[in-house]
Amino acid sequence: QMNKVDAVIVLLPQEFRMDVLALAIENGVHFVETSYALPSYTDLGQLAEAKGISILPECGLDPGIDLVLAGQAIRELDEVHELHAYGTGVPEPAAADNPINYKVSWTFAGVLSAYQRPAKILKNGEVVNLSPSQMFSPENMHKVTLDTLGEMEAYYNGDAVKYLDILNIAETTRSTGRYSLRWPGHAAFWKKMVDLGFLKEEAIHVNGQEVS
């Protein structure tokens, strides 16, 4: 029935999106989704253009609304030297009643994938790459206090540098980062999990037995 609509909006887990995109291109239907763009979208974009349709990734909250707001702010400024973006989705304090002070509002696989994703930032004009373990280290985090929510911890979230060219501020920007906000204690738990290898899919050997 896809050929009977103008656009398909995908809110499915990431593993399904390429199949939906292939169907959208086949049927000549615009494709909108909330996840980060994939490198393969460059080639698929040519197929989409031939069909007269658009592929619009990163149209959610983060990424999405945050980038729209950043673009609007940038257009109102003469020059940008720093760009820092924060996004979050957390349970109310009374519901944060587990060791990670968090509850999944999207997919747990998506949460684990995000916590394995390295971060890329710009600091004093230098590109810095951070491993998943490094982004949860205290020296790479900071606290943010919000009037209605109180204190939260901020850790780096993915590649912030690529957006400088997209937003046309690469020449003037000296520092940039994208951050996720969580209740205090969240990052300390996940740093231990990352350091112990619990987020890796590769099997390890323990006393001669393969464990994954």
List the predicted regions and their residue ranges.
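C-terminal catalytic/substrate-binding lobe primarily of soluble NAD(P)-dependent oxidoreductases
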Residues: 76-212
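ADP-ribose/adenylate-binding Rossmann-like module
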Residues: 13, 22-42
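Short catalytic-loop micro-motif centered on adjacent basic/acidic residues
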Residues: 8-10, 31-34, 55-58, 84
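Rossmann-like NAD(P)-binding element
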Residues: 1-17, 32
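Rossmann-fold NAD(P)-binding glycine/threonine-rich loop
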Residues: 34-58
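Short glycine-rich, flexible loops that bind phosphorylated cofactors or substrates
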Residues: 16-17, 39, 92
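Adenosine-phosphate binding glycine-rich loop
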Residues: 51-95
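Alpha-helical segments flanking ligand/cofactor-binding loops in enzyme cores
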Residues: 18-22, 46
